[in-house]
Amino acid sequence: MVEMFDEVIEGIPVLHAAPAGKQGQPLPTIFFYHGFTSSKEVYSYFGYAFAKAGFRTILPEANLHGARFNGDSAFRLAHFWDILKSNIDELPAIYQHYQREGLILDNRVGVCGASLGGMTTLGAKVRYPWIQAAASFMGSGYYLSLAPTLFPPFEAQTPETRQQLATDLAFLADYQVVDRLEKLADKPLLIWHGLADDLVPAEESRRLIRDLGEQNLLAQVRFETEPAIGHKITVSALDVGVQFFSRYL
């Protein structure tokens, strides 16, 4: 049995899932981030599955999504990368709340996410050493190279606009995994990708695995793919995530 309920932590709506009857007890805790234009409720099946396996799972609502959506879809579309940054920046305050409440068992903290959430996971892992295990589903940690084609804030078709785009997105250099791979792979890491993904190409994950391999950083990395699967989570992907955290967290 699983209990799920809504909370607001530091002004951020979250969905809280825990094994029935254990909500007030210290538990290994996973923070899960949902995808772009989605919501914490849509991805609540991750919370259910992780809670059923014995984990407390906290699903924060990304800025401009779900309960935080202002109704302006065009504005949200132009702020994908700002939302990613906000996810990463907001995580410590949420984590610290549950740590202060004594609800995290033995500092056993995991981060997980899909799509935008997978990208959030990778960016968070290289910034926050208190993360003990991380799982990225159909994500990428190479923000600057992906940003011109994945939800850029505006079309950049001239040298001037391309330069402006690069300037506007320069903040991503401090968040992406480039030059921080040792911090990404120093603890258990799961990378999952559907090979037919046409939104965030599987090559993003392949590139990461190649780069980690070149630096002999694959000892704690698990790389899983599924053929003919596009930009979506499968039942087997969810199972892989549960197995990963059950073993390493």
Language-model-derived ranges and their functions:
Residues Q25-G35:
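Short beta-strand element of the alpha/beta-hydrolase
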Residues R206, G213-L249:
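C-terminal catalytic histidine-bearing segment of alpha/beta-hydrolase fold enzymes
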Residues A78-E101:
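Alpha/beta-hydrolase active-site loop
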Residues M1-Q25:
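N-terminal cap/lid segment of alpha/beta-hydrolase-fold proteins
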Residues A49-S73:
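Conserved alpha/beta-hydrolase
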Residues S145-R206, R210:
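The feature captures the conserved acid-bearing segment of alpha/beta-hydrolase catalytic domains
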Residues I94-F151:
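Primarily recognizes the serine-hydrolase "nucleophile elbow" in alpha/beta-hydrolase
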